[in-house]
Amino acid sequence: MSPSQNPPADSAPDSHCSSCGAPYEEGVSGWPRTCASCGAVAYRNPLPVAVALQPVYDIKGTALVVITRTIAPARGGIALPGGFIDHREDWRRAVVRELMEETGIDAASRDVRLADAMSSPDGHLLLFGLLPERPAAALPPPSATDETEGWHLLRTATELAFPLHTVAARAFFEGRYV
């Protein structure tokens, strides 16, 4: 790749070919788009997100594990544990990885089942993975992570930091993910 084909650090998102680095021609918009330099076709695919629904129980009843975010977007908001699925990562593995990274709670990917799949208005595909219910007393103590203040329990459906998290939590508490 020639130095002139390297996109500048301040270039607009999606303004250069991801295969060869050449800038798209003036006026190129919409998807898919073809690079005039190398012929590669680029598609604007949704960014998949894995979200964990970890039910727990104690003497107060059933609850879901949630986190308080310390990063943007929705810093300070309460959300279900989740994040982007890595390249070539199985979505079930992503569910348990995100659960571990954001809460310290370990789970097996073989135990994850698809509870829901929803598309957000900004183009993200969210896959909600339901894990088996477990005793709250068996969970590790809440502690801060790189992205959260730690975990806590959501006992009823309430508005969460992300609208689709709210929809999924409501569906869980209404018994639609049994």
Task: Write out the residue ranges for each language-model feature.
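Short, flexible, mixed-charge glycine/proline-rich loop motifs
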Residues: S2-P13, Y24-S29
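A generic structural signal for well-ordered coil/turn residues at beta-strand boundaries
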Residues: P13, P48, A74, L125, ...
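Eukaryotic cytoplasmic intrinsically disordered
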Residues: D14-S15, L130
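N-terminal strand-loop-strand
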Residues: S15, G30-A79, A107
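Detector for the canonical C2H2 zinc-finger "Cys2" submotif
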Residues: G21
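Unchanged
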Residues: I85-G175
